[in-house]
Amino acid sequence: MKIVGITGGIGSGKTTVCRYLKELGVNIIDADEIGHRVLQNKGIRTKITDVFGNEVMNPDGNINRKILGELVFGYPERLERLNKITHPLIEQAISSLLEEYRQKGIKSVAIEAPLLVEAGWLKLVNEVWLITAPKESIFKRLHSRMGLSREQAIARIQSQATDNERLKYASVVVNNNCRFEDLKACVQLLAKERLELA
């Protein structure tokens, strides 16, 4: 089974690339989506409130990701503490899904993980595709998609590895500075060359 790690900074276009791969029959594992589910785990919620206080809880008992994000992004030590709580469970969930796909005879899987390098998940993949985009495009996406101010966007960007840091692990670099149809054509070509498609 071929396992590709799709990584890159926030707003670079990882999800779009994965959507195109999914259209080609590649199974997608979204590490952020798993991370959101992990936050619903009662034990994890308790650990998070022990570290960050009850203000990160919604009245319904779930973690308020917006408040938690404001507490950790821009504060590397806090972010590291949060990641130490959540990353082991996220990795465990990804590994379980990969094993399930292996048993089903799935040929190709892409793991969408912005923190693939930082979290130490390179061991889970056969190769890394780095998605990059111009800074201004990223700021616009983060503002329109998440309502982040420029300062909030910068804090999130700075909490992740840089493209240069990720580059040393990348087998493929996809520069997302083009039209959607050009990006799609690029992904289709890469998938045909590097993945086993059904």
UniProtKB/Swiss-Prot annotation:
Protein's UniProt name: Dephospho-CoA kinase
Q: Which Pfam families match?
A: CoaE (PF01121)
The UniProt keywords, alphabetically, are: ATP-binding, Coenzyme A biosynthesis, Cytoplasm, Kinase, Nucleotide-binding, Transferase
State the family named in the UniProt similarity comment for this chain. Answer: Belongs to the CoaE family.
Among HAMAP family, the record links this protein to: Dephospho_CoA_kinase (MF_00376)
> Could you tell me what reaction this enzyme catalyses?
3'-dephospho-CoA + ATP = ADP + CoA + H(+)
Provide a Gene Ontology MF annotation, just one: ATP binding
Q: Write down the InterPro entries for this protein, in alphabetical order.
A: Depp_CoAkinase, P-loop_NTPase
Q: Which GO terms describe its cellular component?
A: cytoplasm
Q: Where in the cell is it found?
A: Cytoplasm
Q: What does this protein do?
A: Catalyzes the phosphorylation of the 3'-hydroxyl group of dephosphocoenzyme A to form coenzyme A.
UniProt keyword Nucleotide-binding present: yes
Q: Which residues bind ATP?
A: G11, S12, G13, K14, T15, T16
Q: Name one GO biological process term.
A: coenzyme A biosynthetic process
**Family annotation (PROSITE patterns):** DPCK
Pathway note: Cofactor biosynthesis; coenzyme A biosynthesis; CoA from (R)-pantothenate: step 5/5
Q: Which organism is it from?
A: Dehalococcoides mccartyi (strain CBDB1)
